[in-house]
């Protein structure tokens, strides 16, 4: 298994696909770079989802999140990109990604992006 940052998310079979249950994963080690100032942005990322057939392999998630540390991204962009990548890989029933960024310049930013599969097919809800 790799030990370097990677954009490759891995999935493993859900042991209870017949049941609706929620998985919550939190890390306070997320870092990216502000594309305007070049300064680091630190955030606590919380991922909540109801899986269908797949769950995320945690080490691959750690390396995926780590891959952003030297990349320039706005808060809203990176939160939605994380959601999109996880939804594409896991095909969950529902998922929410919350990025709670540390205060910079006196401003505290929290971005919440949601996805919910509907009877008509996938539907992505707007970021808060």
Curated annotation (Swiss-Prot):
Pathway(s) of this molecule: tRNA modification; tRNA-queuosine biosynthesis
Single GO BP term: tRNA modification
SUPFAM superfamilies to which the protein is assigned, alphabetical: Tetrahydrobiopterin biosynthesis enzymes-like (SSF55620)
Residues the entry annotates as binding substrate: 56-58, 75-76
Keywords attached to this entry: Cytoplasm, NADP, Oxidoreductase, Queuosine biosynthesis
EC number of the protein: 1.7.1.13
Known catalytic reactions: 7-aminomethyl-7-carbaguanine + 2 NADP(+) = 7-cyano-7-deazaguanine + 2 NADPH + 3 H(+)
Function: Catalyzes the NADPH-dependent reduction of 7-cyano-7-deazaguanine (preQ0) to 7-aminomethyl-7-deazaguanine (preQ1).
Protein name per Swiss-Prot or TrEMBL: NADPH-dependent 7-cyano-7-deazaguanine reductase
Source species of the chain: Thermomicrobium roseum (strain ATCC 27502 / DSM 5159 / P-2)
Top-level taxonomy: Bacteria, Pseudomonadati, Thermomicrobiota, Thermomicrobia, Thermomicrobiales
